[in-house]
């Protein structure tokens, strides 16, 4: 059996799965998908969770099901490329023949002093929930600074204007 190990249930690995599982997948291939959550998240919508305009249940997408696909919930602790295995946070080791690493990205603070220490993230559902809770607790008239004016920053500012018109928002 050949083992394909996919790390991360983000857009990249979902695309790989859809392409492989919608074709005649050779019987000698087993696919294992590892992610910290048992669903795919529409990451481009995390700003709406942070702003409180959409519940996180609306941006969860069920993972595909297939007899040759196994899902493992966990966090990657270590990758041993030489021995061809991935160790998860709980100590479980997963062997592979082919590995795809699609674990997402990290926040970019654009060299803004203090941003790394004093900001909240919307990179994960958990981060977005925490950001929402913090924003919810702000008194009216508070100023919210958004570091980064890319798509997510603009979307967050727009949604915050809708959900919290009492806040001052700066990009």
What are these regions (language model features)?
Residues 1-70, 145-146, 155-171:
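Beta1-alpha1 glycine-rich phosphate/pyrophosphate-binding loop at the start
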Residues 109, 151-155:
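Short, well-ordered, mixed-charge alpha-helical segments that flank or form enzyme active sites
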Residues 10-11, 125, 150:
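Alpha-helix N-cap/helix-start capping motif
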Residues 12, 78, 152:
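Glycine-/small-residue-rich active-site loops that bind phosphorylated ligands and cofactors
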Residues 1, 68-145:
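FAD-binding core/adjacent interface of flavoenzyme oxidoreductases
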């Amino acid at each position: 059996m050949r083992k394909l190990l996919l790390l991360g249930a983000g857009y990249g690995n979902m695309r790989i799965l859809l392409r492989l599982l919608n074709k005649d997948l050779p019987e000698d291939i087993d696919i294992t998908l590892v992610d910290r959550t048992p669903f795919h998240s529409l990451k481009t919508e995390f700003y709406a969770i942070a702003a409180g305009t959409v519940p996180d249940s609306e941006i969860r997408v069920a993972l595909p099901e297939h007899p040759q696909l196994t899902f493992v919930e966990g966090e990657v602790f270590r990758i041993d490329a030489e021995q061809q295995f991935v160790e998860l946070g709980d100590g479980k080791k997963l062997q592979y023949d082919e590995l795809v690493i699609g674990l997402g990205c990290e926040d970019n603070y654009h060299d803004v002093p203090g941003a790394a220490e004093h900001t909240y993230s919307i990179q994960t559902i958990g981060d977005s929930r925490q950001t929402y809770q913090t924003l919810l607790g702000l008194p009216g008239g508070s100023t919210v600074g958004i570091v980064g004016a890319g798509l997510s920053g603009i979307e967050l500012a727009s949604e915050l204007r809708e959900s919290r018109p009492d806040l001052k928002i700066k990009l």
